[in-house]
Amino acid sequence: MSDQKDQMIDITVDFSGGLEILFSNQKHHALSVPAQDAQGKPANVGFLINYLCQTLMTDPRADLFVLGGELRPGILCLINDCDWELEEEDAYVLQPGDNILFISTLHGG
């Protein structure tokens, strides 16, 4: 029997609007992420954002994606094609097969 702490969830994460530059210039990522955070709570989108910064981000400019540990204003997050504001935002608990899309609306000028 496998330990619940070792369980993983298979999801896809996509980046658009220039965010892919922060993640090896790759727009689509098929990931297996821990099913629980360090406190043993079910992994949610807030956990995923931190996880992406720690494990997938290759660019040192994390502030282009997060500010103060939260998703930077101007970045849209869609959970299974729905605005995350309709899905409890960063409290949404990840489910196997979820597709999380981050889109930057920030533009230089």
Curated annotation (Swiss-Prot):
It is found in: Cytoplasm. HAMAP family: Urm1. Pathway: tRNA modification; 5-methoxycarbonylmethyl-2-thiouridine-tRNA biosynthesis. Acts as a sulfur carrier required for 2-thiolation of mcm(5)S(2)U at tRNA wobble positions of cytosolic tRNA(Lys), tRNA(Glu) and tRNA(Gln). Serves as sulfur donor in tRNA 2-thiolation reaction by being thiocarboxylated (-COSH) at its C-terminus by the MOCS3 homolog nit-1/uba4. The sulfur is then transferred to tRNA to form 2-thiolation of mcm(5)S(2)U. Prior mcm(5) tRNA modification by the elongator complex is required for 2-thiolation. Also acts as a ubiquitin-like protein (UBL) that is covalently conjugated via an isopeptide bond to lysine residues of target proteins such as ahp1. It holds the Pfam family Urm1. GO terms for molecular function: protein tag activity. There is a cross-link at G109 (Glycyl lysine isopeptide (Gly-Lys) (interchain with K-? in acceptor proteins)). C-terminal thiocarboxylation occurs in 2 steps, it is first acyl-adenylated (-COAMP) via the hesA/moeB/thiF part of nit-1/uba4, then thiocarboxylated (-COSH) via the rhodanese domain of nit-1/uba4. One of its GO terms (biological process) is tRNA wobble uridine modification. Keywords: Cytoplasm, Isopeptide bond, tRNA processing, Ubl conjugation pathway. This is Ubiquitin-related modifier 1. CDD domains: Ubl_Urm1 (cd01764). Belongs to the URM1 family. One of its GO terms (cellular component) is nucleus. The modification 1-thioglycine is found at G109. The gene is urm1.
